[in-house]
Amino acid sequence: MKIIITGSEGLLGKEISQYLEQNHDIIKLDLLLGHDLTDEDFVRRWFSENTADCLVNCFALNDHVEAGKTRGTLFDISLESFKKFLDVNLTTLFSVCREFARNNKDGNIVNFSASTGIVSARPDLYNGGHKHPAYSISKAGVINLTKFLATHLAPQIRVNCIAPGGVEFDQDEKFKKVYSSLTPMKRMMKKNELNKLVEFLCSTDSSYMTGSTIIVDGGWTIW
């Protein structure tokens, strides 16, 4: 398969790319590679020149990149930052999916939501502060956008979504310990635990699935 991976240089994008490129033709899109997906003209032009069997959308604006900063309450959140999360995580995602669909007669789209797109982020994980609410709201929107696209692009293009829980990387040990204690599986997810699921959703093995959101969170959302 030829697979386009957006956000290919991020935590999950890089892991998924390295796994899939063992058996598939991978095309990488990422801001670090000079691809600005918030630029509508660029997105239109790029997808008109590049077709594929599957689009895997790993890109997202996530406030973990600001983990060193003190987290405030909802009264400290600027509307500018709120709008930016929605613009990148929803508006840009819609643009990318639309241009893939415009230029491919059939295929698959795999989007990424998050467990915080299903339930609210817990303040006790952030010392009483808040993970940015617009991140969670945007990830909830990804689930609905996936259903919308699946409805309107079927049967030619299937669209599904993965909602992962917290992925272990370089968080401080206190965060990992608290997160793990709040999850039935008592640990965070390893970054390679989504690889085969993504490949499954890209393949004909999932040929009767569309509009689905698969939760992979160690049971986080069942409590």
Where are these regions (language model features)?
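Short, small/polar-rich loop/turn modules that mediate ligand/substrate recognition or access, typified
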Residues: 154-158, 209-211
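Conserved NAD(P)H cofactor-binding loop of Rossmann-fold oxidoreductase domains
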Residues: 58-69, 219
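Short C-terminal tail/terminal secondary-structure segment
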Residues: 127, 199, 210-223
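Catalytic loop of short-chain dehydrogenase/reductase
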Residues: 110-154
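Substrate-binding pocket helix/loop in short-chain dehydrogenase/reductase
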Residues: 66-83, 123, 179
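A conserved structural motif in NAD(P)-dependent oxidoreductases
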Residues: 183-194, 205
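N-terminal Rossmann NAD(P)H-binding glycine-rich loop of SDR-like oxidoreductase domains
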Residues: 6-18
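Catalytic Tyr-X3-Lys loop
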Residues: 75-95, 110, 135-137, 142, ...
